[in-house]
């Protein structure tokens, strides 16, 4: 009896690593001479970050600092969706950063179609915000993973539950 193997394609990030990256950025903001007196706040909510600071120059520096800390913690930079900066009153600037999580339906359909077109022996199935790929040959599944890693998608893809 031949068994089937499968894996899931998801778009997720490690929340604790994000918390650590934000904490490191806050600490460095307090230490850096050019950012010390800007009264910068980085607030981490469930699905977004809010950066509030004195001016656009400080905002750009903080954005670069946050991205650097996130990359060093192993987070993909594709999870950050920077919204346009807005005035926060009192000569301050605020920028909201949405955190991308999950694969939307159109991208899931695109991934499933690409797998179906290139690999006839595996079956992709869309299940909510993940795509499950199953097949009888482990090597085919490995080839699917390699093909998807070479593509450039607007979200960071992870491959989990490989059985």
From Swiss-Prot:
<dbReference type="InterPro" id="IPR007551">
    <property type="entry name" value="DUF520"/>
</dbReference>
<dbReference type="GO" id="GO:0005829">
    <property type="term" value="C:cytosol"/>
</dbReference>
<comment type="similarity">
    <text>Belongs to the YajQ family.</text>
</comment>
<protein>
    <recommendedName>
        <fullName>Nucleotide-binding protein CYB_0891</fullName>
    </recommendedName>
</protein>
<dbReference type="GO" id="GO:0000166">
    <property type="term" value="F:nucleotide binding"/>
</dbReference>
<keyword id="KW-0547">Nucleotide-binding</keyword>
<comment type="function">
    <text>Nucleotide-binding protein.</text>
</comment>
<dbReference type="InterPro" id="IPR035570">
    <property type="entry name" value="UPF0234_N"/>
</dbReference>
<dbReference type="InterPro" id="IPR035571">
    <property type="entry name" value="UPF0234-like_C"/>
</dbReference>
<dbReference type="InterPro" id="IPR036183">
    <property type="entry name" value="YajQ-like_sf"/>
</dbReference>
<dbReference type="Pfam" id="PF04461">
    <property type="entry name" value="DUF520"/>
</dbReference>
